[in-house]
Amino acid sequence: CAQCGEVAPQHRSVDQLKTKRWGPNCPTCGEALTPIPTDESKPLQCGSIYALSKKNQEEKCLLFGRTYAFPVVALRYFNIYGTRQELSNPYTGVAANFASRIMNGNAPMIFEDGRQMRDFVSVRDVVRANMLAMESSNADGMALNIGSGQPISIQEVAAELARAMDSDLTAELSQKYRAGDVRHCFGDITAANKLLGYKPQVRFADGLKELVQWLCSQQPQDRAAEMVAQLSEFGLTA
């Protein structure tokens, strides 16, 4: 917040999302907030069952390590993309979802206004991070962010993917929301760099080129509309 400094806003309420006020505001002065990278010291806020399950898994693994003196490192992956990703499951990742839509001649569907930011990291960099964590004891008993460290808006992701696939399709901004989604999420990877020597090597544009080359041999089904219908049925989007 420009007035109050660094703050930790609560999850956006359904009432706020229904009025299409996408950005979180300062809990003290009400001003619009500018997102910053999330480091590992930030309290874990679980706005969805999925998020809570990830938190519980991490805590169980770290507790197992402490209890039985077993080396455990919890890696917090951000938005992974790359070859061999499931393309016909609309819940597996936005890059795969967009690719499936484009390959079936449909425009990518984006929730909210498309300006929400995420941290996309190549599966190749994630594999390197896993190897580093297994080969070093520097981070035993810790949780570390694994991402690219470079935020990008969802609308930009759709546009770059369409260009890489030589498509003139433009993303559809649904102006709908998904309950539990955070507005922005991108990681501070300083700790992983310091403790493991982790440095992302795959630029997003290069990773997309590799993904598109692999896509040429795939025949995905576009099930995005089915996903939206399921979310609507359970009251998780509007």
List the predicted regions and their residue ranges.
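Intrinsically disordered, low-complexity acidic/proline-/asparagine-rich linker or regulatory tail/stalk regions
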Residues: C1-C29, P220-A238
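NAD(P)-dependent short-chain dehydrogenase/reductase
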Residues: C4, A8-L17, N25-T34, I49-A51, ...
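C-terminal substrate-binding subdomain of Rossmann-fold SDR/epimerase-dehydratase oxidoreductases
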Residues: E31-A32, M103-A238
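P-loop NTPase nucleotide-binding/switch module
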Residues: T38
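A recurrent flexible, glycine/aromatic-enriched loop bordering the glycosyltransferase active site
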Residues: S41-Q45
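Short amphipathic alpha-helical "recognition" segments used for binding
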Residues: E58, L62, F234-T237
